[in-house]
Amino acid sequence: MPTVALEPRYFDRMGTSLGDKARMVLPHLRGPRVLDVGAGGGELTEAIAGAGFRASALDAAPDAIARLNGLGGLHEVRQGYAEQVPLLFSEPFDTIVVSALMHEVYSYGTSPETEAPVLGYDAVSLTLTRFRESLRDGGRLIIRDGVMPDRPLEPATVDGLSPMDIEAFHDYLRRSPHPLLRALHLSGRSLTGTRHAIAEFLFTLTWGIETFPREALERYQLFTLARYSDDAADRGFDLVHSESVTQRGYVDALSHLDVTSGGRPWFPATNGLWVFEKR
């Protein structure tokens, strides 16, 4: 995962989604020791601390660390990569929270400083294993991230693309390193592809073309709601709770488009939440 400077827009957008994050995450916390991995600007970490937990934070970006250190009230702040949690924290945690990070682990991989960095699902599996090592028995792992649509390979269509949308599509297609996500066909103002590929493009589009040098590199949706549970079970976790949500901001940002699948109006869920317990 790169440690390049994150633009202020990134922190602003992450901060504006705090209400959704807090609503989804806080009710499932177990304490007292909670670690927020990929804490960014620290809005969620601060909310965790404010709820009475002994909150610690981890992030790889130096500017995120500067923000986190400026918050005050956090137990520990460490700079590093997600799979390095056992190396950076000596005591086990009661809960590890990972919000909007596992897709970055997939997209950018583990620390480039390690002897054999890994990418993709190998990086996800390694990171889940390392999280388990850092949890007490019965401890919780809470993942909030993109969720792949059910029946992800079924076709979907987007009609009504604007000239700016079409320009963004060509830029996205040029930048994306993920063949499955580039399986899209543009005809006039209409775009067709799998539900998964369509959803990935639409959500990236909401960030704006100026963010594509970073955002188009990422694969946001790694698993369907059910499949994440199966994968985590293989790593020694039991599912406690899962849900998917569609954030209104995404719907509003894309309201000029007509999105259909199977001949019916369709809009993909924007986030999933998975609460696991260490077996």
Question: Where are the regions a protein language model picked out?
Answer:
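Conserved alpha-helix/loop element of class I SAM-dependent methyltransferases that forms part
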Residues: 13-31
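Class I SAM-dependent methyltransferase "Motif I" SAM/SAH-binding loop
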Residues: 38-42
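Class I SAM-dependent methyltransferase Rossmann-like catalytic core
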Residues: 1-18
